[in-house]
């Protein structure tokens, strides 16, 4: 079974760069306190690094 991580949006996407808003949508996050469980891949890790100031990650 693939390793998964939980990603929670903790800051608003209002007044953020359009690229960062698109990254949040790509991760499946829509609003504050929304949590999604994703497969831990290099692509997902890269997306998380880009918006790390808006999300919380749980292994």
Swiss-Prot record:
GO terms for molecular function: structural constituent of ribosome. InterPro entries: Ribo_uL30_ferredoxin-like_sf, Ribosomal_uL30_bac-type, Ribosomal_uL30_CS, Ribosomal_uL30_ferredoxin-like. Gene3D superfamilies: Ribosomal protein L30, ferredoxin-like fold domain. PROSITE patterns: RIBOSOMAL_L30. The keyword DNA repair does not apply. One of its GO terms (cellular component) is cytosolic large ribosomal subunit. Pfam families: Ribosomal_L30 (PF00327). One of its GO terms (biological process) is translation. The keyword RNA-binding does not apply. It comes from the Bacteria. Keywords: Ribonucleoprotein, Ribosomal protein. HAMAP family: Ribosomal_uL30_B. Belongs to the universal ribosomal protein uL30 family. Part of the 50S ribosomal subunit. This is Large ribosomal subunit protein uL30. It comes from Haemophilus influenzae (strain ATCC 51907 / DSM 11121 / KW20 / Rd).
